[in-house]
């Protein structure tokens, strides 16, 4: 086992003594230093092997990094070397924005959960693309997803303008693009999951992607990331709409607004999206409903509350083709990646 993997449980108490967002930044900086000095390079050669196909893309294993951990695409290579079969970075907006006031990230250790109200803080599309272009991840055979969103000050009626700018900017540099319409931290964003609003947005993205595919002579798959706080009727409507506009995959799910599982715990009443263990069951229900409605051919990425290999396998059993990790990495460290890949492989999925 890598020294890096062994070190994380020892470092975690010190990290958890810090403000959650500060610890996040310190961890990424430390990971980058370890990568730069070669401490994690050999992990790329020993990436867990559990070959899978997702949206037509060949993966070494079906365990990915969820968007949000590396919003600016500044740590792609260092993160990829932890053993992921694919890496997704962002969410990026056309223009730089600071996000919501700090503090805006809170741990709930008893629930193995996190609440964030970051609000798409990022350096903007130009800086994001420059970072992606510097990365060697794709050249080394890694699969890269780029996640796009809208600026906070863009009226919801003009949201499509931001997504079209984002798609055009990231298209040449992505193996797939994710349309994030489910963050609870951008006002009214989740309204885009509604039937009419979603259809209008996807119609424009479909046409723009066709134009970009012709220009760049390559087809880039498109995924849509949805919330866990949807009724069965809403899930069914989304499941029916996505194929109509040529969407290749769905990511289920983003964070939840529900606090039922953490009521009474410190920070439970903080505004923002709840991630981690309490989201697992919510995500499973959405995945199962999507699979039932969309049939066996749909590409579904399961994310939310994976803190063990068993939970990764449960996502696959519910109907996901692949999984993504974020909060689980904070509580378990990078060893979780290989554990999840091994569990999925052992189950023969």
Swiss-Prot record:
Quaternary structure (record): Monomer.
PANTHER family hit by this protein: DIHYDROOROTATE DEHYDROGENASE (QUINONE), MITOCHONDRIAL, DIHYDROOROTATE DEHYDROGENASE (QUINONE), MITOCHONDRIAL-RELATED
Predominant cellular place of this UniProt entry's protein: membrane
Organism, scientific name: Bordetella petrii (strain ATCC BAA-461 / DSM 12804 / CCUG 43448)
Protein name per Swiss-Prot or TrEMBL: Dihydroorotate dehydrogenase (quinone)
Entry membrane topology: Peripheral membrane protein
Subcellular location: Cell membrane
Cofactor binding, per record: Binds 1 FMN per subunit.
GO cellular component, one term: cytoplasm
């Amino acid at each position: 086992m890598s020294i890096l993997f062994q070190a994380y449980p020892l470092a975690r108490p010190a990290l958890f003594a810090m403000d959650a967002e500060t610890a996040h930044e310190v961890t990424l900086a430390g990971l980058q230093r370890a990568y730069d000095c070669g401490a994690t390079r050999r992990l790329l050669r020993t990436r867990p092997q559990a070959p899978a196909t997702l949206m037509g893309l060949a993966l070494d294993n079906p365990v990915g990094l969820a968007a949000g951990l590396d919003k600016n695409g500044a740590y792609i290579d260092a993160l990829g070397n932890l053993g992921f079969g694919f890496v997704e970075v962002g969410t990026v907006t056309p223009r730089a924005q600071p996000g919501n006031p700090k503090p805006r990230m809170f741990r709930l250790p008893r629930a193995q959960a996190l609440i964030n109200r970051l609000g798409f803080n990022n350096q903007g599309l130009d800086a994001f693309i420059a970072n992606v272009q510097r990365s060697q991840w794709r050249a080394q055979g890694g699969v890269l997803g780029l996640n796009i969103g809208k600026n906070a000050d863009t009226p919801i009626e003009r949201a499509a303008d931001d997504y079209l700018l984002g798609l055009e900017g990231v298209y040449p540099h992505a193996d797939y693009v994710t349309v994030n319409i489910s963050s609870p931290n951008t006002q009214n964003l989740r309204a885009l999951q509604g039937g009419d609003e979603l259809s209008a947005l996807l119609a424009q993205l479909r046409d723009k992607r066709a134009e970009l595919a012709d220009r760049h002579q390559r087809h880039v798959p498109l995924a849509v990331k949805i919330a866990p706080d949807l009724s069965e009727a809403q899930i069914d409507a989304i499941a029916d709409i996505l194929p109509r506009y040529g969407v290749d995959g769905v990511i289920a799910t983003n964070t939840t607004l529900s606090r039922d599982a953490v009521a009474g715990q410190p920070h439970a009443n903080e505004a923002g999206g709840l991630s981690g263990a309490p989201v697992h069951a919510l995500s499973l229900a959405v995945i199962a409903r999507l699979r039932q409605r969309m049939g066996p051919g749909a590409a579904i990425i399961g994310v939310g509350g994976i803190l063990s290999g068993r939970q990764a396998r449960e996502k696959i059993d519910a109907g996901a083709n692949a999984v993504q990790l974020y909060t689980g990495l904070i509580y378990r460290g990078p060893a979780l990646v290989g554990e999840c890949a091994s569990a999925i492989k052992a189950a023969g999925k």
